[in-house]
Amino acid sequence: KKIKRETEEDENENEEERNERSEMKRYAFGYPSGEEKKIKRETEEDENENEEERNEEGSEMKRYAFGYPSGEAKRMKRKPAEEETE
């Protein structure tokens, strides 16, 4: 019985220490548990979306600027080069 009580007391102390540490982290970072990760994830997702939009806009602008659909200008360059070698 004595050993069982000691292990229960140790477990309770360990749990209290974990709670204190997590509470200290919350105060240190200024966010409730897990909130900081969520905010970081949301900002990364927003950055990825913005980058995708920029890439789409850039490729669309190139198409309009050069007047050819994607890859068509390269094919047109290749054809005269192939005709010269024949």
Swiss-Prot record:
Disulfide bonds: none annotated. GO terms for molecular function: opioid peptide activity. Residues 8-17, 44-55 have a biased composition (Acidic residues). The keyword Secreted applies. One of its GO terms (biological process) is neuropeptide signaling pathway. One of its GO terms (cellular component) is extracellular region. Residues 1-86 are annotated as: Disordered. Transmembrane segments: none annotated. It comes from the Eukaryota. The modification D-alanine (Ala) is found at residues 28, 65. The keyword Magnesium does not apply. Expressed by the skin glands. Keywords: Amidation, Amphibian defense peptide, Cleavage on pair of basic residues, D-amino acid, Endorphin, Opioid peptide, Repeat, Secreted. Residues 34-43 have a biased composition (Basic and acidic residues). Residues 1-24, 35-61, 72-86 form a propeptide. Dermorphin has a very potent opiate-like activity. It has high affinity and selectivity for mu-type opioid receptors. Belongs to the frog skin active peptide (FSAP) family. Dermorphin subfamily. This is Dermorphin peptides.
